């Protein structure tokens, strides 16, 4: 007895899979089957050209979206739907929220897992807040791009006073930053500073709930979140020297990936890159970590030169060392400027200063 005839759908399916037998022409009623398979194949072919790795906080996502939008605007092939994908990665710093950063220990608390994903090929580029990036980069990675720097100043946020100077003695200021803590206590020793972690929204909620009387946040982050109006006032750089690379976004890729390097180089803002390099060299010489209050700021002055200021302090604000430099706005000169300033403060502080911070 001959075998029963195949249904048209089965025949079409085997034909599409490359079956050596084709027993009958697909009937017209099977066209939707072929069309569905074709659409699925086309969708699978649209693989993202760039996968952006980022933390999942609202601010980190805002920075990733800014990067994506700049890439799409600069390169027409990336403007296609799905060409750029954002991949959220949770870092150690995101997972441990009940301890001060200084107590967690180690470097790269907000970058290591993202860099690991980059090296493993799970993402193509990594978007970081430069202030979170250790002074050394993992082997096999490169950071060819800094986006234009945002406002480097800190914002003072309070429901009852317009500035730190107006806070009554004994007022509690919330901050997870030893840099901010040391400078606050140096100028206002009557205030109390307590550990205050969480993303921007969490900290603002805690402030409204009365956990603290005031807090300080990076103005750059508030601006990127369209929340600048949240600031009660803005502290000048003279009042509060910013963190190294504050307000700067850095984008890393694998050092072997020429395609990504070319994409990122097209977005690089050279003035920012040079300023960040100067500040990070200062930090590198001091071998700063989460237990060391360090601040630095390099900028182009009205004459086009680099103006640099650096600070090293004890967490309680009882000891503060400061230095400044001016020189041509040139990469090699600025790196040397940061290095020289770091060595100056390291010598002023002496080895005992750093031993006491361990």
Curated annotation (Swiss-Prot):
Binds 1 dipyrromethane group covalently. GO terms for molecular function: hydroxymethylbilane synthase activity. Residues 1-24 form the signal peptide. Its cofactor is dipyrromethane. CDD domains: PBP2_PBGD_1. It comes from the Eukaryota. GO terms for cellular component: chloroplast; cytoplasm. Tetrapolymerization of the monopyrrole PBG into the hydroxymethylbilane pre-uroporphyrinogen in several discrete steps. PANTHER family: PORPHOBILINOGEN DEAMINASE (PTHR11557:SF0). This is Porphobilinogen deaminase, chloroplastic.
């Amino acid at each position: 007895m001959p075998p029963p005839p195949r249904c048209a759908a089965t025949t079409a399916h085997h034909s599409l899979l490359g079956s050596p037998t084709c027993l009958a022409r697909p009937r017209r009623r099977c066209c939707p089957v072929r069309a569905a398979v074709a659409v699925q194949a086309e969708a699978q072919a649209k693989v993202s050209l760039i996968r952006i790795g980022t933390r999942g906080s609202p601010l980190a996502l805002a920075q990733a979206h800014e990067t994506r939008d700049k890439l799409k605007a600069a390169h027409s092939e990336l403007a296609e739907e799905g060409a750029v994908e954002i991949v959220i990665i949770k870092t150690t710093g995101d997972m441990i929220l009940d301890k001060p950063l200084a107590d967690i220990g180690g470097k790269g608390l907000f970058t290591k897992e993202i860099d690991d994903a980059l090296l493993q090929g799970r993402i193509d580029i990594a978007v970081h807040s430069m202030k979170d990036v250790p002074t050394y980069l993992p082997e096999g990675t490169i950071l060819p791009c800094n986006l234009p720097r945002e406002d480097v100043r800190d914002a003072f946020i309070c429901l009852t006073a317009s500035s730190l100077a107006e806070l009554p003695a004994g007022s509690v200021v919330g901050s997870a930053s030893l840099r901010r803590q040391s400078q606050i206590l140096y100028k206002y020793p009557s205030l109390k500073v307590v550990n205050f972690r969480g993303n921007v929204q969490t900290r603002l909620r805690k402030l409204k709930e009365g956990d603290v009387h005031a807090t300080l946040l990076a103005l750059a982050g508030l601006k990127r979140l369209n929340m600048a109006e949240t600031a009660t006032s803005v502290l000048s750089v003279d009042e509060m020297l910013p963190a190294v690379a504050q307000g700067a976004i850095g984008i890393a890729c694998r050092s072997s990936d020429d395609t990504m390097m070319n994409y990122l180089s097209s977005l690089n803002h050279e003035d920012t890159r040079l300023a960040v390099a100067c500040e990070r060299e200062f930090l590198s010489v001091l071998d700063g970590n989460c237990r060391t209050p360090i601040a630095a700021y390099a900028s182009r002055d009205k004459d086009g030169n680099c103006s640099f200021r650096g600070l090293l302090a004890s967490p309680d604000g009882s000891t503060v060392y400061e230095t400044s430099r001016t020189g041509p706005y040139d990469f090699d000169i600025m790196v040397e400027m940061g290095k020289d300033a770091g060595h100056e403060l390291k010598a002023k502080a002496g080895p005992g200063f750093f031993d006491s911070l361990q």
